[in-house]
């Protein structure tokens, strides 16, 4: 695998609470899994837990082999979150990793070949997953059409469309 989707137990619980507001009722299915992963992370010196089968030669940047544990039953978590290849990181380590690992891109506004404004941007890595809710209790037909268009098309969020950033695919979590 070339990358894993990193998250924390706290973020997953926030997602479950959020999705329950929309009637998804996923808490019972996943809470036992989260408790098992928490037990693995409570062990001294453990900083991350890979959800999936242990693979020979697996390397997760920033973590030594003895700092990583494995949780082999990834079906429930992957189905609820809609993603595969997950690594759960302790909250304090996650914050540190994010602050060190977000790509920073230097940008420069040029006017007639001369620099007028140099600035730096942190960008969210490709394949990042976000969640949001969309509700409408009125105008059901228009709402269904809106949701269909969201799922069928890429949506550009934020600036930087000209350099390929911000293109987003919306999918309903089932």
Report the location of each language-model feature.
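Basic, Gly/Ser/Thr-rich N-terminal segments that form RNA-phosphate-binding interfaces in CRISPR RAMP
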Residues: 1-174
């Amino acid at each position: 695998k070339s990358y894993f989707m990193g998250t924390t137990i706290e973020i997953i619980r926030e997602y479950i609470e959020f999705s329950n507001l929309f009637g998804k009722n996923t808490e019972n299915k996943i809470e036992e899994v989260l408790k098992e992963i928490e037990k693995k992370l409570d062990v001294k010196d453990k900083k991350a837990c890979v959800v999936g089968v242990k693979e020979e030669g697996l390397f997760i940047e920033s973590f030594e082999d003895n700092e990583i544990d494995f949780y082999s039953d990834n079906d429930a978590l992957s189905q609820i979150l809609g993603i595969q290849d997950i690594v759960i990181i302790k909250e304090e380590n996650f914050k540190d990793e994010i602050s060190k690992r977000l790509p920073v891109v230097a940008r420069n506004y040029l006017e007639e070949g001369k620099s007028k404004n140099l600035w730096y941007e942190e960008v969210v890595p490709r394949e990042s997953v976000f969640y949001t809710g969309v509700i409408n209790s009125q105008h059901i037909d228009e709402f269904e059409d809106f949701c269909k268009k969201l799922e069928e098309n890429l949506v550009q969020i934020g600036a930087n469309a000209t350099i390929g950033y911000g293109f987003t695919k919306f999918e309903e979590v089932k």
